Amino acid sequence: MTSRDVARAAGVSQATVSLVLGDKWRGRVSERTAGAVREAAADLGYRPNLAARDLRLGRTRTALLVVPALTNEFFARVHTGAARVAAEHGFGVVIYPSPEGVGRARDPFDSSRTALDGVIASSMAADALVAMRAGGLPLVMLDSDPAGPEAAATVNIDVADGMRQVTEHLLAQGHRRFLHLAPAVDSWTFHVRADALAGALRAVPDAAVRTETSALTVDAARQAAERALTGPGPRPTALVCDDDILAAGACKAVRRLGLRVPEDVSVSGFDDLSLATAVEPELTTVRLPAEEVGARGMAALLAVLENRPPESVALPVELIVRGSTARAAD
């Protein structure tokens, strides 16, 4: 069975069959014709020899997904979304960890610069992009500066809106003394969150915020929150955390100091990981569409590889109000 048989059954040319089965028909072939080709191929039991075609085109049908940590649930969800879309198009996804997401990444192309078709990089610090660009492959950035020159496409989450939603929720609860617990990571996404928090509080004359940074671990966050809560000046009544892991550490700090969440101190997170409902009280947090981020990232890479304009998106987020926030005590 060959593509010629499919073309004859569908009443089209072999070139049209190649376009449709190679998923390059959009803008060249009508949906009706594409459907007829797929139906004819299915009826005849025809499957194109992708390996031969890819060898001819110099393709490996493999994408590299760069994430800061393999153990982080958010990035596991990103991979799930990317792998699902990749599988639908006959691609595979290889995961490459860039530990902590900071500093210069080890060059992933050292072993073979021809074993990949493109790179999707998630929430990377700026310095870690050097090796990615050195590979000379199409790069799609996730949750990164859309104005940056490094990427062929970007897929973003509206983290600024998420931070504004959290801040407005806490302001409505009467909070005016804020602590921002931020990761010690030089990343665009965290700068955007900090700017959004500061901007939302700037319009409230009696509101104040100070920032404490921490490594992205529960214990480091606990120590940072303890320092902030026992430091000089009035104690913050609201701890705004850039990640649910940081928020879990902040909750531990509050309890160790003999205080209560949320009666004495409200705590909010970001991501809506499984951890958010595993702690007590459950975390008020911002739900990020991690799986959709991965799916859109893979779709954008496929568009770049097929010389189609990738879709620029800023995916919406949702504030999830749970038990860790309440009205300010004073």
Residue spans of the language-model regions?
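Hinge/beta->alpha junction and helix N-cap segments in small-molecule ligand-binding domains
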Residues: L50, V67-R77, I95-R104, T154-Q165, ...
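Generic beta-sheet signal
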Residues: S122, L142-D143, I157, L181, ...
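Flexible loop/turn connectors
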Residues: T230-D330
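N-terminal helix-turn-helix DNA-binding module of bacterial transcription factors
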Residues: M1-G58, A329
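Short beta-strand segments enriched in small/hydrophobic residues
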Residues: Q14-L19, L55-A69, H169, R177-A184
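Periplasmic-binding protein-like
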Residues: A115-S123, R177-A182, T211-E212, P232-D243, ...
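Alpha-helical recognition/docking segments in bacterial nutrient-uptake
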Residues: L57, T62-E168, A172, P234
